[in-house]
Amino acid sequence: AKTGRPRRVGPIDLVATRYGVEVQGATNIALTKLDILSYMKEIPVCAAYEIDGEITREFPFPSVLAKAKPVMEYRPGWCCDISGVRTWEDMPAAARDYVEYVEQAIGCHIGYVSVGAERESLIVR
């Protein structure tokens, strides 16, 4: 729904997202707000956590979660407006690569990608 509020986004946490996919048994998900990343040269992602000097890609027990520090990686951006894109084939290659990277990292098919606040801004893959 369009509320008039600014659309805000932060780096995706692949560790927590993968855990959520596993716990919920998800097999097909939507990646939303991809258009907000449109003019970033690099897109940050939390690819792992550092806990007590150890790097892990597994979601930690709640008792140690507070000690987890994000380990960031950076993906190439696409530096163009994608809000008018309506097909997967018309998406810039770097945007498709980002979606496929997230899909592989979380172990779940991304069947829908939103590229704007409008109802028509949903791409079915």
PLM segments and residue spans:
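Non-transmembrane, aqueous-exposed alpha-helical and coiled segments at domain scale
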Residues: 1-125
